[in-house]
Amino acid sequence: MSVTVIPFAEGEAQLNWHALCDAIERGHQLPKAEIADSFLYRDKDTLLSRSAWVDGLGLAVKSATIFSGNVVKSDPMVNGVVSLFSDDNGTLEAIVDFHLVTKWKTAGDSLLA
């Protein structure tokens, strides 16, 4: 099994706003995603996972860690990853940079609206 890894710079170099908006619009024509969120806590730290399954397209799990203490260490407070899985057999197909997805999906939704 070969898993594609898409880091921020590599992914951003391949994206453009018009194509992204077209893709989001096409996605809205697919069956509605089943979505579930989970939160885990340790003191002030948080792990958030959002899972989505679009029948006929696939599954995505976006996990984010929020470590407020990182600020004092000059480390990013929010980190994460997006894992994409096959709709056919559930195998991992890609690992995508969290910040790439957050930036482009959030802005793309706003542009499309």
Question: Model-derived features: where do they sit?
Answer:
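N-terminal ligand-binding/catalytic initiation module
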Residues: 1-103, 111
